[in-house]
UniProtKB/Swiss-Prot annotation:
SUPFAM superfamilies in alphabetical order: Pseudouridine synthase
Task of the protein: Responsible for synthesis of pseudouridine from uracil-55 in the psi GC loop of transfer RNAs.
GO biological process entries: mRNA pseudouridine synthesis; tRNA pseudouridine synthesis
Entry superkingdom: Bacteria
Protein name: tRNA pseudouridine synthase B
Species per Swiss-Prot/TrEMBL record: Shouchella clausii (strain KSM-K16) (Alkalihalobacillus clausii)
Active-site residues, record numbering mapped to chain: D40
EC nos: 5.4.99.25
């Protein structure tokens, strides 16, 4: 039987998200593996990876809010907006900022904001990724995007090299937010070039660092031990309401039937479970037929 479930991985620094997917394909002996939100190589932390038929839920996990802890450094800007790029601007910070000043700066970024993705990013413009233009030395107009910062807090003032100022922060944001760019924009508001000097993802939707298993620990496991670490695919769908189907309704759902809408189903998408607690399907309102609902994704044979 094909392995199916979700691995909550604690990705180490130095690995790309694709590296992790490649390794999971080897360990679980299946090609059907997908991750749910890229982490840059030098960013560590929570990376949920879907195995086997659990890849059906990747599209729902990509919309998760993410939480990070990191560090911003004022005084130096880089090509990549993080600590690994070439220095492009420097301005000495002669006087340290107070906690009150930093907290006021951060407050200005809470809510919906506009971001311009960094040149060294995977965003596509005219069919090519921005990092391809950057490596070729070609400047192009970068599209802005609206993202939402749901929480942004100062955790501590950290030690910086002479002429710089650094602080640690925690942020919760919507998908597509570039924390590197957020760090740069905070610096601009403070009047200094800046970059993101550290970053760790601590949560992706319902999956937290407390759930995550280090890659090094997976490497030491047998196949059976790895299979035991797989979480059911519906743990990724906790944000959808659930309805229990009786045996007769279960038969119809398994056949992908269009059903009459019931008041108990609510107005949005929801999950059907059978009486044994197995996740059967995600249903939605029929797009053209009022009063009916149809399956969006079937999980019956998982």
């Amino acid at each position: 039987m094909e392995p199916t479930g979700i691995v909550v991985l604690d990705k180490p620094k130095g690995w790309t998200s694709h590296d992790c997917v490649h390794q999971m394909r080897k360990w679980f002996q299946t090609r059907k593996v997908g991750h749910t939100g890229t982490l840059d190589p030098e960013v560590d932390g929570v990376l949920p990876i879907c195995i086997g038929k659990a890849t059906k839920v990747v599209k729902y996990m990509s919309d998760y809010d993410k939480t990070y802890i990191g560090e911003v450094t004022f005084g130096v800007a880089t090509t990549t907006e993080d600590a690994h790029g070439e220095v492009v601007e420097e301005k000495r910070v002669n006087k340290p900022f107070t906690r009150t000043e930093i907290e006021a700066l951060l407050q200005a970024f809470i809510g919906k904001i506009e971001q311009t993705p960094p040149y060294y990013s995977a965003v596509k413009v005219n069919g090519k990724r921005l990092y391809e233009y950057a490596r070729a030395g070609i400047e192009v107009e970068r599209p802005t995007r609206t993202v939402e910062i749901k929480a942004l807090t100062l955790t501590e003032i950290t030690t910086a090299k002479p002429g710089c100022f650094s602080f640690a922060f925690s942020v919760t944001c919507t998908k597509g937010t570039y924390i590197r760019t957020l760090a740069v924009d905070i610096g601009k508001k403070a009047g200094y070039p800046a970059h993101m000097s550290k970053l760790t993802r601590t949560a992706s939707g319902p999956f937290t660092q407390a759930d995550a298993i280090p890659l090094s620990a997976f490497a030491e496991m047998s196949l059976d031990e790895r299979l035991n670490k797989l979480r059911p695919l519906d743990t990724a769908l906790q944000h959808f309401p659930r309805v229990t189907a009786d045996k007769e309704l279960e038969k119809r759902i398994r056949n992908g039937a269009v059903l009459e809408k019931s008041a108990s189903f609510g107005d949005g998408r929801f999950l059907f479970y059978n009486e044994q607690g197995d996740c059967l399907a995600l249903y939605q309102a029929h797009p053209t037929k009022a009063g009916l609902i149809k399956p969006e994704t079937l999980f019956c044979h998982v």
